[in-house]
Design a protein with these regions (language model features):
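Conserved CoA-thioester-binding segment of acyl-CoA-metabolizing enzymes
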Residues: 1-57, 90
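Hydrophobic/aromatic residues within transmembrane alpha-helices
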Residues: 17, 54, 66, 114-115
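Hydrophobic alpha-helical membrane-association signature
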Residues: 32-36, 84, 114
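Glycine- (often His-adjacent) and acidic-residue-rich active-site loop
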Residues: 56-91, 107
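CoA-thioester-processing core
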Residues: 88-94, 102, 108-138
Length: 138
């Protein structure tokens, strides 16, 4: 599977989905949303996979949304939620196999939501989950 912002690795019966924008602490942009949907759909439909691990590349799980993105194709917030984020999270929560969040470093904003959507979270000593939505009036 050729994805720009996600790496998918299969080790025996385990699929590892890795957010791969380490230079931006795996900040979630539109491309990552589409790539994540493809990756989770593929893993969901692969009957040989028994467990899914979601993690981040580099020194963080995810710093949250990429607020610097200017050229998204969303037609407003409702479109982003309905076409992008709703299926993004439904693919995690409806996964017919256990989903483990392997969290190193920050999981903030949308990264925190990804972590909390997993069935189980395993965190390093320096990890933290930060819900920043109230700080930005969401």
């Amino acid at each position: 599977m050729d994805l720009e912002t996600i790496n998918v690795e299969k080790i025996e019966k385990v699929a590892i989905i890795k957010l791969n924008r380490p230079e931006l602490l795996n900040a979630v942009n539109e491309q990552l949303v589409w790539d994540f949907q493809k990756a989770t759909e593929s893993v969901k439909n692969d009957e040989s996979i028994r467990v899914v691990i979601i993690t981040g590349s580099g020194r963080g799980f995810s710093a949250g949304a990429d607020l610097s993105e200017r050229k998204a194709s969303w037609k407003g917030s409702k479109d982003a939620l309905m076409r992008g984020y709703k299926p993004f999270f439904e693919n995690i929560t409806s996964m017919p196999k256990p989903v483990i969040g392997a969290i190193a470093g920050p999981a903030a904003g949308i990264g925190a939501a990804i972590a909390m959507s997993c069935d189980l979270r395993v965190m390093s000593d320096d990890s933290y989950i930060l819900s920043v939505f109230s700080n930005i009036a969401l």
